[in-house]
Amino acid sequence: ECLDLPEKTYVACSGGPDSMAILDFLIRGKRDVTVAHFNHDTPFGRFAEKFVKSYCEKNDIKLVIGNIQKEKDSKESWEEYWRNERYKFFESLDGPVITAHHLDDVVEWWTFTSFHGNPRLIPYRRNKTIRPFLSTTKDEIWNWVDRKDIPYVTDPGNFDDKFARSYIRNNIIPQALKINPGLRKVIKKKVEKHYEDEERE
């Protein structure tokens, strides 16, 4: 049985392995999904749009595409700029949007925000966005990709350490896991308690 999610929803899909896995999972769960793809107006962004468009056409999946709407503010990092534009697009849609954020993303975000003195978790729900896979590890998602032979594209920016989140993902998290191999379990407990608190509100 699929998760307790709306029967009709958008799925944020970048074309990467995480979002392609979640899209496949929801389609197999007989959900009425429309792919919401955002083009970040980079060479890879244009390539990813072609990939997602081709996949949706081949599999008869509805698709909407969002694009950059304003120039970058000099005070914003590129990561902030792309994220803000992407979420503006999601908020413009006429229904809930499921994203593929997983437990490893939460660990990364918690670490990133800790460096700024305010450790935070990724919420399960905010405005139109639903993140139902926050207790699922990246390895579990990749296992689904391998088992179902799901195609995907890889964003080279994920390996570019000039981006703070990439640097944390590629360098700091591996070292943190050596110090505390149970870090994911610690964060998972925080996530599940946070979800329970959200549901009570």
Spans of model-derived segments:
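ATP/NTP-dependent adenylation/nucleotidyl-transfer catalytic domains that generate, transfer
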Residues: 162-201
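Core alpha/beta nucleotide-donor-binding catalytic domains of modification enzymes
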Residues: 1-171
